A protein has these predicted regions:
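Short, flexible active-site recognition loops that position polar ligands and cofactors
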Residues: 102-106, 122-132
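Amphipathic alpha-helical regulatory segments at dimerization interfaces
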Residues: 43-44, 122, 144
Length: 151
């Protein structure tokens, strides 16, 4: 009996599951998939990740979306603008990010970045005071951004 091995099987066996889950969260938020974002948040926290880490990862992604959007607005072809991502996008994520670029205007990205930046400043201030940004607050911020993608 021979079984077919899929790319998902390989990812599950070899991939860094925390980065896969973080990518799942980033893509769910940026695509406006609120339920999927909520599930990814649950998986991240169950795996020991802090949502402050997730906020930073989502912010970095939106910064690159902002850069790519600016390149596209100045006449750079979308495929070339996608090469601005560092590290380079995995081939499976390219279509997802292409969809994100269609969903997010420069202005919407700037609003999301302002919210993410403020939440990171608040988290740093709370950490300096010996407390942490409540996980629920960080999760609500990410879900709020996911809902904004739908508008």
């Amino acid at each position: 009996d021979t079984a077919l091995i899929t790319l998902d099987d390989v990812d599950a066996a070899l991939g860094d599951q925390s980065s896969l889950t973080l990518d799942s969260l980033i893509d769910a938020v940026a695509l406006g998939r609120v339920a999927a974002a909520d599930q990814a948040l649950t998986r991240l926290t169950a795996g020991g990740q802090t949502l402050q880490t997730a906020l930073g990862a989502v912010r970095r992604h939106f910064q690159i979306l902002h850069l790519a959007t600016g390149l596209i607005e100045s006449g750079t072809p979308q495929t070339q603008a996608l090469s601005a991502f560092r590290p380079p996008l995995h081939f499976r994520r390219k279509p997802l990010v292409e969809n994100q670029l269609r969903l997010w205007s420069r202005r919407k990205i700037e609003r999301a970045l302002a919210l993410l930046h403020k939440s990171e400043i608040d988290a740093r201030a709370m950490r300096a005071a010996g407390t942490r940004l409540p996980e629920a607050v960080a999760g609500q911020i990410l879900l709020r951004i996911a809902r904004a993608a739908q508008r």
